[in-house]
C-alpha cells in the first residue's frame, strides 16, 4: 500500500478539515433542542440517533488526511465513552475548538511545544475546578435527574434511579429488549465479575459491542485450556445440544482459542471464552461460587474431573450471559436456591472464623456478589430502530448515573465550563508567550458546548455564553425553557466524571495534533481502468 506524506501546513489543514467534519455532524445533537442524525449503514436499516459516540463511530472520510483528523477526534469520543459512558459530544466539541485555535496559532508561527504546555496546565486547572464545584449525589431524585438529562426521558430517569436503589451504586444494571412495547424494570439474581471476552470476535451485538448468550452451556475449568484434543469432545457436547457455550478458565490459548474464534466467525457455534478473575485461592473460591450459581461442575484434575472425559453433565447454565470487553454478567443461573443459600451460609461462617482482615474483606465481597441482584431494564418500543435507539439512551443514562454517584455533579448545559473558563483566563496571566496562548485557547474552547446548546435552541450563542459566565456556580442557561436559573435545582446536571474525562481526552488529542509535523497515511488505491467487460469489485 503506498503511503502519502504531507508536512506541516498541508498535513494540519487536512487534519483540521476532518476534525471539523466529524465535530459538525455531532454538534447539532447537543442540548435538549438538539436534532437527531440519521446514519445510513452499509447494511441493515438506517439508525436515527442523538448519541455522539454512535455518530462518531460511523464517520469515515475519503480523503486520507481528513480521515486522520476525524479518527483522532473519534478516539476522543470513544475514550470518553469508555471511561464515563457519556459526554462524547462535549468532548468532541472541546477537541475541535482547541485544535482549531491551536492550529491557527501554529500557522502564525507559535511554538507547538509551548502551546501544549499551556493546554496541559490549563487542563489540570480545569479538572481541579470541576472537582471543587462538585455537588454530591445521594438521593434517588438526584440520580433520576442525571439519568433524565442523559436520556432526555423522565421515564428512563426514574427506572435507572429505581434500579440503582435496588442494587446499590456499585451494583449491576443491564439493558435488554423487552418482548412488548412496554419498558419496565426487573431485578433478578445475577453475578458479575471484571473480566471480559478473550477475543472481540466473540461479540454478537455490534451496536453495543457485547457478546450475549441466551441459555448457554457454561463450562468452568480450573486450569488453562491449551490442548485441542482434550477440549474438542466437550465442545462437541455443546454443539450436539445446540447451545451457545461460555467458557471460564484460568486461560484459553493456542488452538482451542483459535477453534472458538473460527467457529464464532463462521457462526457454526456461539462461544465466548473468559479468563477467570483473581488469583490463587481467591480464584479457586470464586470459581466454586460460580459452579453453585450456575449448577456446573468445575473441571479439575486434582479432584479427578478431567477435561477430556467430561460430558454434558459438567455444564451449568443461566438465562443469559452478557460479556463486554471488561465484564461478565451471568443472570439467573440455574443453580438451586437451596445450594446458593448453603454456599452463602458457608461464606458467612468463613467471615466469622477468620482473623485476617484481608480474607474477611474478600469473603464479604464474595458474599455480596452471591447475594447481589442484577437490575435489568427491559426496553420496549414499537419498531426495531426505535428499540435500538432507546437501548443506547438507557445505557448512556445508566453510565451517567453511575458516574454522578462516584464523583458528584455540576450544573449542566456546559455552564460550569463557561464559568471555569473565566477563572482559567485569570490563571493564564501566570504564563507568557505561546504557553499563555495555549491556556487561552482552552479557555475559549470551554465556552463552546454552551454556545452550541444555545445555537441549537435558536438563540445567539455568544450572548448566552457571556450571560452564563456572569452567573454564580450552579446557575446557567436552561435550553428547554430558554431561561436562566439554578440548574442544579432544576435537575439539569452533568456528572463531574463525564465532564472531566471530556476535558482530559479532548486536550490530550489536541496536543497530539498540534505537535504533528508530518502525517503519513495510506494512499487510496486508484480505481482500476475498466476493460471491455465489467469487473465485479469485492470490497
Curated annotation (Swiss-Prot):
Compartment annotation: Cytoplasm
Gene Ontology annotations for the cellular component aspect, listed alphabetically: cytoplasm
GO molecular function: ATP binding; ATP-dependent protein folding chaperone; isomerase activity; unfolded protein binding
Principal location listed in the UniProt entry: cytoplasm
Pfam families linked to this entry: Cpn60_TCP1 (PF00118)
PROSITE patterns named among the record's database cross-references: CHAPERONINS_CPN60
CDD domains according to UniProt: GroEL
Binding-site residues for ATP, renumbered to this chain: 29-32, 86-90, 413, 478-480, 494
InterPro entries: Chaperonin_Cpn60_CS, Cpn60/GroEL, Cpn60/GroEL/TCP-1, GroEL-like_apical_dom_sf, GROEL-like_equatorial_sf, TCP-1-like_intermed_sf
GO biological-process terms attached to the record: protein refolding
Documented EC number(s): 5.6.1.7
Gene3D superfamilies xref list: GroEL, GroEL-like equatorial domain, TCP-1-like chaperonin intermediate domain
Keywords: ATP-binding, Chaperone, Cytoplasm, Isomerase, Nucleotide-binding
Top-rank taxon: Bacteria
Reaction catalysis annotation: ATP + H2O + a folded polypeptide = ADP + phosphate + an unfolded polypeptide
Functional note: Together with its co-chaperonin GroES, plays an essential role in assisting protein folding. The GroEL-GroES system forms a nano-cage that allows encapsulation of the non-native substrate proteins and provides a physical environment optimized to promote and accelerate protein folding.
PANTHER family reported in the protein's UniProt record: 60 KDA HEAT SHOCK PROTEIN, MITOCHONDRIAL
Family affiliation: Belongs to the chaperonin (HSP60) family.
Quaternary structure note: Forms a cylinder of 14 subunits composed of two heptameric rings stacked back-to-back. Interacts with the co-chaperonin GroES.
HAMAP family with a match to the protein in the record: CH60
Name assigned to this protein: Chaperonin GroEL 1
Amino acid at each position: 500500500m503506498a503511503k502519502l506524506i504531507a508536512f506541516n501546513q498541508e498535513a494540519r489543514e487536512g487534519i483540521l478539515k476532518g476534525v471539523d467534519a466529524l465535530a459538525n455532524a455531532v454538534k447539532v445533537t447537543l442540548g435538549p433542542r438538539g436534532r437527531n442524525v440519521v446514519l445510513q449503514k452499509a447494511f441493515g436499516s438506517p439508525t436515527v440517533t442523538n448519541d455522539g459516540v454512535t455518530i462518531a463511530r460511523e464517520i469515515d472520510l475519503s480523503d486520507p488526511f481528513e480521515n486522520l483528523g476525524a479518527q483522532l477526534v473519534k478516539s476522543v469520543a470513544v475514550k470518553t465513552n469508555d471511561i464515563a459512558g457519556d459526554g462524547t459530544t462535549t468532548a468532541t466539541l472541546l477537541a475541535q475548538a482547541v485544535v482549531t485555535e491551536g492550529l491557527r496559532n501554529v500557522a502564525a508561527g507559535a511554538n507547538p511545544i509551548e502551546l501544549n504546555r499551556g493546554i496541559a496546565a490549563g487542563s489540570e486547572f480545569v479538572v481541579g475546578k470541576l472537582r471543587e464545584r462538585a455537588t454530591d449525589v445521594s438521593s434517588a431524585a438526584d440520580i433520576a435527574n442525571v439519568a433524565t438529562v442523559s436520556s432526555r426521558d423522565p421515564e428512563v430517569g426514574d427506572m435507572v434511579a429505581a434500579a440503582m436503589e435496588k442494587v446499590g451504586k456499585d451494583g449491576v444494571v443491564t439493558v435488554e429488549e423487552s418482548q412488548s412495547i412496554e419498558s419496565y424494570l426487573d431485578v433478578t439474581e445475577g453475578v458479575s465479575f471484571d473480566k471480559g471476552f478473550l477475543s472481540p470476535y466473540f461479540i454478537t451485538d455490534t451496536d453495543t459491542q457485547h457478546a450475549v448468550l441466551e441459555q448457554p452451556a457454561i463450562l468452568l475449568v480450573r486450569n488453562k485450556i491449551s490442548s485441542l484434543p482434550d477440549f474438542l469432545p466437550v465442545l462437541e457436547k455443546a454443539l450436539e445440544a445446540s447451545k451457545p457455550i461460555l467458557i471460564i478458565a484460568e486461560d484459553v490459548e493456542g488452538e482451542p482459542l483459535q477453534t472458538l474464534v473460527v467457529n464464532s466467525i463462521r457462526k457454526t457455534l456461539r462461544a465466548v471464552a473468559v479468563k477467570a478473575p483473581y488469583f490463587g485461592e481467591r480464584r479457586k473460591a470464586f470459581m466454586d461460587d460460580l459452579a453453585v450459581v450456575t449448577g456446573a461442575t468445575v473441571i479439575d484434575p486434582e479432584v479427578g474431573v478431567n477435561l477430556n472425559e467430561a460430558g454434558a453433565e459438567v455444564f451449568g447454565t443461566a438465562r443469559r450471559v452478557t460479556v463486554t470487553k471488561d465484564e461478565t454478567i451471568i443472570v439467573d443461573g440455574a443453580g438451586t436456591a437451596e445450594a446458593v443459600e448453603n454456599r452463602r451460609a458457608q461464606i458467612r461462617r468463613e467471615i466469622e472464623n477468620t482473623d485476617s482482615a484481608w480474607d474477611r474483606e474478600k469473603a464479604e465481597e464474595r458474599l455480596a456478589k452471591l447475594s447481589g441482584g442484577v437490575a435489568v431494564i427491559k426496553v420496549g418500543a414499537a419498531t426495531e430502530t426505535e428499540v435500538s435507539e432507546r437501548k443506547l439512551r438507557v445505557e448512556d443514562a445508566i453510565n451517567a448515573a453511575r458516574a454522578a454517584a462516584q464523583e458528584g455533579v455540576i450544573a449542566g448545559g456546559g455552564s460550569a465550563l463557561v464559568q471555569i473558563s473565566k477563572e482559567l483566563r485569570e490563571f493564564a496571566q501566570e504564563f507568557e508567550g505561546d504557553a499563555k496562548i495555549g491556556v487561552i485557547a482552552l479557555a475559549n474552547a470551554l465556552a463552546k458546548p454552551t454556545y452550541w446548546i444555545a445555537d441549537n435552541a435558536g438563540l445567539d450563542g455568544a450572548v448566552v455564553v457571556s450571560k452564563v459566565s456572569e452567573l454564580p456556580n450552579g446557575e446557567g442557561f436552561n435550553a428547554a425553557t430558554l431561561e436562566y436559573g439554578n440548574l442544579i435545582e432544576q435537575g439539569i446536571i452533568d456528572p463531574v466524571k463525564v465532564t472531566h474525562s471530556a476535558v482530559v481526552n479532548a486536550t490530550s488529542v489536541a496536543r497530539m495534533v498540534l505537535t504533528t509535523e508530518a502525517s503519513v497515511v495510506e494512499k487510496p488505491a486508484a480505481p482500476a481502468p475498466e476493460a471491455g467487460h465489467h469487473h465485479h469489485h469485492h470490497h
